[in-house]
């Protein structure tokens, strides 16, 4: 009697799933208006998490720390003491 010793090999490599390959969507934070730019009341000036920049004159702070203009005017980014920054909106004299 004839004995055959056959061994079969996988025709496809086993594929493992990766735990990488995804990233969160960007939040589009940062300055939305430049220094010296004219803005209308309600315009968003700066989107941030926490108070990286503080609200100055005629600028409000939203629930998510977004800074917005309260009046029509010109944007001015300023220093507030040694290590803090603020953004203000000044009315334009007509």
Swiss-Prot record:
Pfam families: Ribosomal_L27. One of its GO terms (biological process) is translation. One of its GO terms (molecular function) is structural constituent of ribosome. The N-terminus is cleaved by ribosomal processing protease Prp. Uncleaved protein can be incorporated into pre-50S ribosome subunits. Cleavage of the N-terminus of bL27 is essential for growth; it cannot be replaced by a 'pre-cleaved' or non-cleavable form. Disruption phenotype: Essential, it cannot be disrupted. The keyword Repressor does not apply. It comes from the Bacteria. Residues 1-9 form a propeptide. SUPFAM superfamilies: Ribosomal L27 protein-like (SSF110324). Keywords: Ribonucleoprotein, Ribosomal protein. One of its GO terms (cellular component) is cytosolic large ribosomal subunit. Belongs to the bacterial ribosomal protein bL27 family. Part of the 50S ribosomal subunit. A mutant Prp protease unable to cleave bL27 copurifies with its substrate. This is Large ribosomal subunit protein bL27. It comes from Staphylococcus aureus (strain NCTC 8325 / PS 47). The lineage of its organism: Bacteria, Bacillati, Bacillota, Bacilli, Bacillales. The gene is rpmA.
């Amino acid at each position: 009697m004839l004995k055959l010793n056959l061994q079969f090999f996988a025709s496809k490599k086993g594929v493992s799933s990766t735990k990488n390959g995804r990233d969160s969507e960007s939040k589009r934070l940062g300055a939305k208006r430049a220094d010296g730019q004219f803005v209308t009341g309600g315009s968003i000036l700066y989107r941030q998490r926490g108070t990286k920049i503080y609200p100055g004159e005629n600028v409000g702070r939203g629930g998510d720390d977004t800074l917005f203009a309260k009046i029509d005017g010109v944007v001015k980014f300023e220093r507030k003491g040694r290590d803090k920054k603020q953004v203000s909106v000044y009315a334009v004299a007509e």
